[in-house]
A protein has these predicted regions:
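Extracellular parallel beta-helix/beta-solenoid repeat domains
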Residues: 10-316
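Sec-dependent N-terminal signal peptides
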Residues: 2-10
Length: 316
């Protein structure tokens, strides 16, 4: 009986929570422009991966990349559509197949990581349609990846946002990691309807074109004990990007904890380290989502409330 129960417990575990086979490891580490579909736990022990990696759908739940200090880098420059590592949901009939419990650990990532539910791969049709229904936040979160852990990763950004957490993604953890290189935008973007991220104990040495972390209609996140070198740019901005691409933002950037972070290199005249309510509708496209009685369609304001900001320091 005990053996039967143990077997059932193993069968009930995440489908990709098993060691990669030798054949899978060889395919993963083969240089290619074609993304490798990861359905196992890869312990690379320092071996480099020279191709994009795709972790997609419920069948990839429990998958892991443990690089042992090795590098992940595609043969071509990473883009938003073909990222270095993609953790994506997939349309499955009337619903969505989403991965959960994915880990990326001890890797050097050249390019970017994209975590997406609705809108994965650049198709905005489902996201736009869902946003025009009153239960959009719940639907987006049910469709999106959850419990993705990023531990001791060095991001070497090459222009695009190194870590994008897409609409509805929940419980993302980023710890002990370093953001370096350059981004024309931010280092981390927490997009609308996402929630529950923990960003703790990281170093931001990256040069960005704007603030380091954008909290865009994302709630209940914890950004704690990080070190930011701002190079004259902003730090952490909380807002709601009303109307962009016609998508209605339902959730507000509320109930976030931003504490015990250290900022250096802030602008002398206007040091903007943590800004709660950074936009308040001041964008030309805010009217593009007009016509519905909820979310940013009804109110262009950021609506930030219940945020805790304390213990942060600015050094020169």
């Amino acid at each position: 009986m005990l053996a039967l129960l143990a077997a059932l417990a193993i069968q009930a575990g995440p489908p990709a929570a098993r060691p990669c086979s030798t054949a899978e490891m060889n395919a993963l580490t083969q240089r290619s422009a074609e993304p490798y579909r990861l359905l196992c736990r890869a312990a690379l022990a320092g071996r480099d991966v020279r191709r994009p990696v795709l972790i997609e759908g419920a069948e990839a739940s429990g998958a892991a990349l443990d690089c042992g200090g090795g590098r992940i880098e595609g043969p071509d420059e990473a883009t938003t559509r073909v990222p270095t590592i993609a953790v994506w949901s997939r349309r499955d009939g009337a619903g969505w197949s989403r991965p959960s419990g994915v880990t990326v650990r001890d890797c050097r990532v050249t390019g970017n990581i994209r975590i997406w539910g609705m809108g994965a791969g650049g198709s905005m049709r489902d996201l736009l349609a869902s946003s025009r229904t009153p239960g959009h936040t719940r639907a987006a979160q049910a469709a999106a990846p959850t419990q993705v852990r990023i531990e001791r990763v060095r991001f070497e950004a090459t222009g695009t946002i190194p870590l994008y957490v897409g609409p509805g993604v929940t419980r993302t953890t980023v710890t002990g990691s370093t953001f370096a290189g350059r981004s024309t935008s931010t280092a981390i973007y927490l997009d609308a309807e996402s929630a529950g991220a923990e960003i703790r104990g990281n170093v931001f040495a990256i040069r960005t074109g704007r603030e380091q972390i954008a909290v865009d209609g994302s709630g209940a996140n914890r950004i704690v004990d990080n070190r930011f070198a701002l190079h004259g740019q902003g730090g952490i901005f909380l807002y709601r990007n009303c109307g962009e691409d016609g998508v209605i933002r339902h959730q507000t950037p509320s109930y976030n904890q931003i504490t015990d972070n250290v900022f250096s290199g802030a602008a002398w005249l206007r040091p903007r380290t943590v800004v709660v309510g950074a936009r308040e509708g001041r964008r030309r496209y805010c009217g593009d989502d007009a016509g519905w009685p909820f979310g940013s369609s009804a109110d262009d304001g950021d609506g930030a409330r219940g945020n805790r900001v304390s213990g942060n320091r600015t050094t020169r």
